[in-house]
Regions:
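Glycan-binding loop/region signatures in secreted carbohydrate-active enzymes
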Residues: 91, 107, 227-230, 236-238, ...
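Short, acidic/polar
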Residues: 46-61, 123-138, 201-211, 257, ...
Length: 383
């Protein structure tokens, strides 16, 4: 005969054993269902040197615009093109349509990064540069500053570089952050400081992103140009995953983001860069339908709208690398290979961004997608 007290205790214990995992399951479900409090960023670069009217930008589909580029002149920053002021004014006018829009200006880029190492090298030069950044920002009414230093500690387009760039880059960002916050207290606002970063391991090795990110609002990772204008062989220039067909030690968006996370950057500060252009190689060897094959030319930039026009000729065969999650085109008649981004890749990348808890997406560059096919897909996918 079972003791009633023992029987009651057994039943109570059984109920608890049943309810405890149910409680945690419900708690986990609740956690997963918690809505994202901060909207995803959609950041578009607008190049001042392109023949494009910034007033045509659809600001309703963007959270941020980065106007490119300001140059480094005599230790400070300055716009060099005669058309810059007019174009900047038109961008600022977009805030009447989208009051929450943030407009930043970007310093440097591939051509104008030659002086970064010098201005970052000394305490006095960092202070001078930071003050100049704030002055130019205030002059035109920008909401912040974006640095596109290509690249700290490495050779690029005739740029100066030195071993101390790694530490000096972080010091420069800290100085700019101080200057922006000082001005922000006066204006009762928060001014943004962001950077564009390289996607390869070499960039990680020559910077200290774990420390640098402490001074930054977010980081735009340039997840493109994995095969570019120096390569005399074809390849995916913006693939999300590594390709099982890879021959030349290429890169991928997944690997680029993983490197940044490992370097100490929080996922919500990482913004994935997406190209609104392709890379084209000519006189390509036809083996394997031209993927990862030698070419007589390097990978030149082709705007997305131009690729769409090329397809109308009927000479291009659409190809897809399932392992890399990347599209490419092969023109057997003219031996032309094009690596390009399509709405399919946009969807896959926005899914990846959400899965990883990242901050959003960035793209280069607005004028390269005239009919906004890629932008519309990006906006719909992120929302």
């Amino acid at each position: 005969m079972v003791n009633p007290r023992t029987k009651y205790t057994f039943i109570k214990s059984s109920i608890l054993i049943f309810l405890i995992p149910l409680f945690f399951a419900c708690s986990e479900a609740k956690k997963k269902e918690e809505p994202r409090t901060e909207p995803y960023k959609i950041i578009g670069y607008v190049a001042g040197y392109e023949d494009f009217n910034p007033a045509l930008v659809d600001a309703t589909k963007l959270t941020h615009i980065n106007y490119a580029f300001a140059n480094i002149v005599e230790g400070g920053v300055a716009f060099e093109l005669k058309t810059d002021s007019v174009k900047i004014s038109k961008l600022m006018g977009l805030k009447t349509v989208s009051p929450a829009l943030k407009v930043l200006y970007s310093v440097g880029g591939w051509v104008w990064s030659d002086q970064f190492s010098h201005v970052a090298a000394f305490d006095w030069s960092r202070k001078k540069f930071a003050i100049s950044c704030v002055q130019l920002m205030k002059k035109h009414g920008f909401d912040g500053v974006d640095l596109d230093w290509e690249y700290p500690g490495q050779r690029a387009e005739d740029n100066a570089f030195r071993p101390s760039d790694e530490e000096n880059f972080t010091r420069l960002l800290a100085e700019i952050r101080i200057a922006l916050d000082t001005q922000g207290k006066v204006d009762d606002t928060h001014y943004l400081l962001t950077i564009a970063t390289g996607a390869d391991q070499a960039y990680i090795n020559h910077t200290d992103l774990g420390q640098a990110q402490k001074h930054l609002d977010f980081i735009n990772v340039m997840c493109y140009d994995f095969y570019h204008g120096w390569h005399f062989q074809t390849g995916h220039h913006a693939n999300l995953h590594p390709s099982d067909k890879e021959k030349f030690n290429g890169n991928s968006g997944l690997e680029a983001i993983s490197r940044h996370l490992k370097a100490g950057v929080p996922a919500n500060k990482l913004v994935m860069g997406i190209p609104f252009y392709g890379r084209q190689w000519e006189k390509v060897i036809a083996d394997n339908e031209s993927l990862y094959q030698p070419a007589r030319s390097t990978g030149v930039i082709v705007p997305y709208w131009d690729i769409v026009e090329k397809l109308k000729s009927g000479n291009y065969k659409k190809m897809y690398d399932e392992s890399a999650k990347s599209s490419y085109l092969w023109n057997a008649k003219d031996s032309i290979f094009i690596s390009w981004e399509t709405p399919k890749e946009i969807q896959l990348k926005t899914d990846f961004i959400k899965e990883k808890g990242m901050g959003g997406a960035m793209f280069w560059e607005y004028s390269l997608d005239k009919d906004q096919e890629l932008l519309n897909k990006l906006y719909d996918s992120m929302n």
